[in-house]
Regions:
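Substrate-recognition/cap regions that form aromatic- and gly/pro-loop-enriched pockets
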Residues: 343-432
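Midchain, well-structured core segments that form catalytic/ion-binding scaffolds
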Residues: 102-105, 145-146, 156-367
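Active-site metal-coordination/substrate-binding segment of hydrolases
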Residues: 64-146, 151-162, 202, 317, ...
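Active-site-adjacent substrate-binding region
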Residues: 225-227, 232-250, 403-446
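His/Asp/Glu-rich mid-to-C-terminal helical/loop segments that flank catalytic regions of hydrolases
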Residues: 36, 157, 222-240, 272-274, ...
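Zn-dependent metallopeptidase/amidohydrolase metal-coordination segment
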Residues: 7-11, 345-361, 421-479
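Acidic/His- and Gly-rich active-site-bordering loop/insert found
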Residues: 2-102
Length: 486
């Protein structure tokens, strides 16, 4: 299979166009202009709100003008991540894709199918002339990945439909009817630097090759967190060296909503201890590799000498390492309802640590399907960093989307799936934030579902789209549109 044979052709044509457009989160200007031009070229009513969300309306197929208006929604931004050795500028370069068996992938970067494929499906609906449907509103929100900015900023009345299909889910055959709420915690350790004592040797330790992944949807997959592993080594080694280890820098993770998959620490130890530290690192690496021998088979531990540099004041560095060792990470509780007892209810992810000349900045993200538990988890993380002397702020929260009893749209979506594929879809919730949570606050009467084609390893350069599932989602969506229209 080559790219010219991908089906539905109209969807993949639109996806190819989208991947020519740089669209990092918070930098969606080119995508907004593309969508405006698309709407105008097809003579469709096109609106852009103050936040930058785009809405394109398409009139009903003749004879279905009085049908219920249905909203199709996706987000226009993408997570930008690449392999370390890949030369790529997400603000200028087009995503380069290739077919690998039944999967569509990108060359060394994120693919942008989250949620570019949702946008492509919407554009294909708008461009098509042979689909039966009632009135449609196609909505493209901005900056979903780094703050749900578009959904936060959307005012009541921008959308007018009473049913909404969100096209930002990642497992074909699953229909999502609820999602977790979330919040981020930001901790900063301020410090001054000093010269290391005489007789110290500088070392660099790095970890790479972890799977990473989405900090909501993948949090229960027993994947390693690079930050927690490196912090664990520093804590253990400093204890073993009677507190003589001196920290220069700690850098790991890039995005608040991804599990960090690589990282690097620079530190100094007494000359007399350097060989012991190397031996300890190798033992530590073997232990961690054994702990994750199923889920992390490509992790790589490296250690080398490093140039001398001013070290962080010891009192601050030690408290920083202790805080990272102590702070909760991973899935913490599962849902109490028996029907979904398998699903993560509350989690936390230490997402990024960045060191500059005078501060260490940490971002951790908390999620829960129960808003009171979200507040408690956020306070738990906050308290750990406050106890260590950090300056802590908490970001805006987004609400959970609660399952709607007697949802007409869920019923339509399930029946359409059964008609097409002869089996029941899985109706479930997701431990990740969807814009549906914010829409449910602004539009409390909105009946919503979320589904999409199968994606793997989102938010990483290994992101992949399962090609056959795109046609399945397309057919499913068209059947729902026909059902609503009739």
């Amino acid at each position: 299979m080559n790219k010219s044979e991908l089906k539905p052709a109209l969807v993949f044509e639109q996806f190819a166009k989208i991947n020519e457009i740089p669209r990092p989160s918070k930098h969606e200007e080119n995508m907004i202009e593309f969508l405006k031009s698309f709407g105008e070229a097809h003579q469709l009513e096109t609106l852009v709100d103050e936040t930058g969300n785009v809405l394109i309306r398409k009139a009903a197929t003749p004879g279905y003008e009085h049908a219920e208006t249905i909203i199709l929604q996706s987000h226009m931004d993408m997570v930008c991540d690449k392999l370390v050795d890949v030369d790529f500028d997400f603000h200028k370069d087009a995503i380069q894709t290739y077919v690998d068996g039944e999967w569509l992938k990108a060359k060394g970067t994120t693919l942008g199918a989250d949620d570019g494929i949702g946008c492509a499906i919407e554009l294909a609906i708008l461009a098509s002339n042979d689909i039966e449907h009632g009135p449609i509103e196609c909505v493209f929100t901005r900056d979903e990945e780094t703050g749900l900015t578009g959904a936060h900023g959307m005012k009541a009345g921008f959308m007018t439909g009473k049913m909404l299909i969100n096209l930002d889910s990642e497992d074909e055959g699953e229909i999502f009817v609820s999602c977790a709420g979330g919040q981020t915690t930001h901790a900063t350790f301020h410090f001054s630097r000093e010269e290391a004592p005489a007789g110290y040797f500088f070392m660099e330790a790095s970890l790479k090759g972890l799977n990473g992944g989405h900090s909501g949807d993948d949090i229960n997959k027993k994947r390693a967190n690079a930050i927690k592993i490196l912090a664990r080594f520093l804590f253990l080694e400093n204890e073993k060296l009677d507190g003589s280890l001196r920290l220069v820098s700690f850098n790991s993770g890039k995005m608040h909503n991804a599990i960090p998959r690589d990282g690097k620490i620079v530190f100094a130890v007494k000359n007399a201890d350097k060989e012991q530290v190397r031996a300890d690192w190798n033992i530590f690496a073997s232990e961690v590799e054994d702990e994750f021998h199923v889920t992390e088979q490509t992790m790589q531990f490296n250690m080398s000498s490093s140039d001398a540099a001013p070290v962080i004041k010891k009192a601050v560095a030690d408290k920083f390492v202790m805080a990272l060792q102590a702070v909760d990470n991973g899935p913490l509780t599962t849902c109490q309802d028996e029907a979904i007892a398998w699903m993560v209810e509350t989690s936390s992810n230490v997402a990024s640590v960045m060191t500059d000349e005078s501060s260490i900045n940490i971002v951790a993200s908390q999620r829960s399907n129960v808003m009171s538990n979200l507040a408690n988890m956020t306070n738990t993380v906050k308290a750990a960093f406050l106890l260590a002397g950090a300056e802590v702020t908490v970001g805006d929260k987004y609400p959970a989307w609660k399952m709607r009893a007697n949802s007409e749209l869920t019923d339509l979506a399930v029946k359409a799936y059964e008609k097409l594929f002869g089996k029941e879809p899985l109706v479930k919730g997701i431990h990740a934030g969807l814009e549906c949570g914010l829409f449910s606050e602004r539009y409390p009467e909105l009946d919503m579902v979320s589904f999409g084609p199968t994606l793997r390893n989102v938010h990483t350069p290994d992101e992949a789209l399962l090609i056959p599932t795109v046609e399945m989602v397309w057919d499913h969506l068209l059947e729902i549109l026909r059902s609503v229209a009739k």
